Amino acid sequence: MLLRPRRLPAFSPPSPASPDAELRSAGDVPVTTSDAFATSGGMAEPGSPKAPVSPDSAQRTPWSARETELLLGTLLQPAMWRSLLLDRRQTLPTYRRVSAALARQQVRRTPAQCRRRYKFLKDKLRDSQGQPSGPFDNQIRQLMGLLGDDGPPRVRRRSTGPGRPQRRGRSSLSALAPAPAPVEQEAELPLAAENDEPAPALRFSSSTTKSAGAHRITSSPPLTSTDTLPPEPGHTFESSPTPTPDHDVETPNEPPGLSQGRASSPQVAPQSLNTALLQTLTHLGDISTVLGPLRDQLSTLNQHVEHLRGSFDQTVSLAVGFILGSAASERGILGDLRQ
């Protein structure tokens, strides 16, 4: 049983001789030549720690311009961007080295913060189309070009493992495309066995040979007495015509409508659209035939309304004249009586 080294106290700084216990307990990737190259050559000072910044001692303030410039400068070093380019799925060890390099320059940022910061800058540069350029756009473009991130954002794909079910679209395509291949192979194997070994083929008949010759037997005329006779001693099985695998003949293991369904499946959608359009046009013709008489009836009703309006005007004028005449006659009669 391996004994883990005792964790150093939080208040005591890590010594140069002993690396941080968190790095060793996490079981990180061992130091390679690229790691040694990253820690040497201007990035590491003599006597500085090589461990990344822990979340407890990291800064929680927003990134400043100096911190962003140091982060991009660290990522643009060949050891860093080559490590990110070689292993895209496991970028955390590389960002641990970036965090350690920034810690030596008095920037306390965790590996996750460094990764999120670069992703934020990359997305912001992609979204800033037609806007004025920022102070770090050239470095971000250079880093994106080195890492191959200058194209459109990638769609994350998950590899189908042994325990992961396949998607429905892929399974249906794989079920349709390579389905006839095993049938043809199974049909070719018995034929080769019959040609190579005639006697065992007659003695032991497999189900595959029976199923392969079922279509030939059903389509051929009924057997006569000569066909039922056993073969002659000198007559071998090779003299009989061997059935050649014909792609037009349906195999017994394949459903009868599968080959026709494959040929007509691309034409199903256009036929259904044409049928729907024809039905729509037929319904529109029926509607027009129904609306024609209704239009005639509405025009007739409009004429009747006009006639009724004229007769109503005449009736009103006659009534008004009758009322005025009766009033005038009453006035004349009353005037004569008073005189």
UniProtKB/Swiss-Prot annotation:
Expressed mainly in pluripotent cells with expression rapidly down-regulated upon cell differentiation. The keyword Transcription applies. It comes from Mus musculus. GO terms for biological process: positive regulation of transcription by RNA polymerase II. Residues 171-193, 218-229 have a biased composition (Low complexity). It is found in: Nucleus. Residues 261-270 have a biased composition (Polar residues). This is Undifferentiated embryonic cell transcription factor 1. Binds to the N-terminal region of ATF2. Associates with the TFIID complex through interaction with TBP. Residues 279-310 are annotated as: Leucine-zipper. Its main location: nucleus. Pfam families: Myb_DNA-bind_4. The keyword Metal-binding does not apply. It comes from the Eukaryota. The modification Phosphoserine is found at S15, S18, S48, S54. Keywords: Activator, Nucleus, Phosphoprotein, Transcription, Transcription regulation. Acts as a transcriptional coactivator of ATF2. Residues 1-62, 144-270 are annotated as: Disordered. The lineage of its organism: Eukaryota, Metazoa, Chordata, Craniata, Vertebrata. GO terms for cellular component: nucleus. InterPro entries: Myb_DNA-bind_4. Residues 154-170 have a biased composition (Basic residues). The leucine-zipper domain is required for coactivation activity. When this domain is deleted, the protein is able to stimulate transcription from a number of gene promoters. One of its GO terms (molecular function) is transcription coactivator activity. Phosphorylated.
